[in-house]
Amino acid sequence: MNQPIHNAYWLTRFDSILDSALAQHRAISLIRVDLRFPEYMPATIMDTDLDSAVISRFFESLKAKIQAYQRKKRCANQRVHATSLGYLWCREFGKMYGRKHYHVILLLNKDTWCSLWDFTVSSSLATLIQEAWCSALRIEPWLGDGLVHFSRWTPSRKPTSPAAPPSSDDTPLPSGCSDTRKASDKKSGGSAVLWVTRGDKEAVQKALERARYLVKNETKLHDGSGQRNYGCSRGPGRLLDGR
């Protein structure tokens, strides 16, 4: 089977975003998340085929929620670690049903969030991401179950032995809370959160491998609609510190 053909331009853009994040922070948390649409959404709320601004609304909402989280900590006299929000996204369509969805990489200060926690904790990063996506979709948060999907990364390779578990590009983790589980409960492969420390070349290469999955040309739609298949943050980015 041929390897996916990657978009070199967007891979270079991601490399630049990663460099900017590491220039601002000693270490970052890289998070892979899939954003999906409800199977049925009344056109009076949003036409998912035409509304290309939904992904922009997601990032604006997430920034606002991070600021509110930081402000709450500051008001409680808790230590606040400022964070930028770097990101890369791609728009894809499922092979079987052709349903539109987004794959996203988020880059945040590791001192601010080193894990996702889970959806049962109102202040967790997982919850903030889900609420931001619901806000972008203009639906109530309680309707967001199953629409935000965090993934565990396993490099594409053949099993080293017949007993080895099969590999896949992205394998789901329940509740997106890989970093809060006991070691005995963890599956093989990398977690939903990748830590990248400044100067760690091996971790940088792992980050680029995750980005390559997003920038493959397969499953992208080129229909002349004018809607973008890719997007990313620009420059170093504003520090979100609750002020």
PLM regions with names:
Residues I28-Y40:
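Active-site-flanking beta-strand signature of metal-NTP-handling nucleotidyl enzymes
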Residues S29, L85, K100, R210:
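Residues that flank catalytic or metal-binding motifs in active/ligand-binding sites
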Residues G86-W113:
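Histidine-centered divalent-metal-coordination microenvironment in nucleic-acid enzymes
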